[in-house]
C-alpha cells in the first residue's frame, strides 16, 4: 500500500523526534521534528524509490507536511491509488 511505503521512507529519512508509527496520516511532520534539510533528503529518497521527480509546483512545504499530503502527491505523479 502506498501509505505504508511512504511511512517507511519517512521513518528512514525524516529524522523525526516521534515514531512514525505513532503519527496519524494527517499529523504535521514538521511538528514531529522534520527539518527543511531532512525534508530535502526525504524528497530525494521518495523520488528514487518511486522513480519520479517532483515538479516545481510541488516543491512546497505543504507537499511534505504530512504522510497524507506526501501520499497524495506521489499518487498524482505515479497514478497509484492513495
Task: Please identify what each model-predicted range represents.
Residues 1-35, 41-44, 48-82:
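Phosphopantetheine-dependent thiolation modules in NRPS/PKS and related acyl-activating systems
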